[in-house]
Amino acid sequence: MRLISLIGAAIWVDFIVMMITKLGPGQRVPFLPPAGALNLWYDKFGLAAVSADVLSAVIGVLLATFFFPNAWGLGLVFASIFIQVLHDLFFYFVILAVPQGQNQMIDVFKAYADEGGWTILLADALIMTGTVTIATVWDLLFSYRFIAFQTLLGMYSLIYITYTK
């Protein structure tokens, strides 16, 4: 998997998450976390929040390729979800240990964890699934130049939706 495909896919998946979160207020999907703390995350931290989301997905998939070097397609999806679940559980214990008020981002994550509970694991698994699937399809179908264009277009679009109310 090309890194440009992975980064571009993570950007577009985050764009989709933000569209659902920002443009569908009040639309509660029963098996996904509520959008309250997630909207606060994007509203308060803007592009830093977007960067953290995209980098989290990219690093998770890259770790999956390191630990499971022969994984591809559905195997890579499952490997990425495995890494993501480990990360989410570890990160949950980290945020519990950080006192309220010490880190603004961690404070929002605490609210998100309280609000979303186990549904966060499912939402993050869908993010990993989308990222791996899009990156894999792009690698199979498109040239490097076209993927680079899609990635830049995604970055450009993500900047604008980040500041949409």
Regions found by a protein language model. Give the residues of each.
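Juxtamembrane/disordered regions of integral membrane proteins
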Residues: 1-119, 129, 133-165
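Phosphate-/polyanion-interacting regions in eukaryotic proteins
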Residues: 122
